[in-house]
Amino acid sequence: MSTATSPRVLNHPAREDIRLGPVLHALSDPVRLRIVRAMARGAGEEFSCSYFALPVTKSTCTHHFRVLRESGVLRQTYQGTAKMNSLRRADLDALFPGLLDSVLAAADAQADRLGEELPAQGG
Amino acid sequence: MSTATSPRVLNHPAREDIRLGPVLHALSDPVRLRIVRAMARGAGEEFSCSYFALPVTKSTCTHHFRVLRESGVLRQTYQGTAKMNSLRRADLDALFPGLLDSVLAAADAQADRLGEELPAQGG
């Protein structure tokens, strides 16, 4: 009988296997970009999924984190049964200098222009 | 009876309607990124579709140019029956300073790393 536990092996591309196309695709979704912006504000820290107060279902949230992980944008690790997430900034900056910062700046500029704010963070 | 002529009205977002998500999505596809890289090397010039020697069918090529146009990455205009394409660099740079340059630099770095070259240009 299967259990409700997720598979314990989480696939991540090695730094040299990260590709620009999947990274841009991962960042092109507004919900995923929100996640990345929130993580970038807490540099180096790890966040559980529930940290991000996202206007989507849990399964959609899981999907978005998987896209971010499989593209190489973030790293997910288990701490007990919780997945913790951290931005792979060192890998991205080494491969694509300035790219992540310019995307974050563009997102900030657009949010200012449109009067959007990052959602309040969960507990 | 319909003719083979494409509709003559080509929709473009105004500068203020260009959004980061669709721009990143447009740039996330390898073929579209090739087109943008080739155009960026000829700053300000206009190119016909046939300029780009792309390994895709004509209808796929048309699709890619439409995605680039509708996201605001390039402008398409008719000159006679030919569509000419130009990068909307001024609009993109005004909205998202440094973004296009960092994506182009990232694409160059990746191509160098993987030993890829831009395709030979058509006639």
Ranges and model annotations:
Chain A
Residues 1-2, 80:
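N-terminal cationic amphipathic segment used for targeting or macromolecule association
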Residues 2-19, 37-41, 89-123:
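Amphipathic alpha-helical dimerization/coiled-coil segments
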Residues 5-9, 25, 34, 38-41, ...:
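N-proximal short alpha-helices
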Residues 29, 64, 97:
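Conserved acidic functional residues
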Residues 50-74:
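Canonical helix-turn-helix DNA-binding module
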Residues 74, 85, 107:
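A short beta-strand-loop micro-motif that forms or neighbors metal/cofactor-
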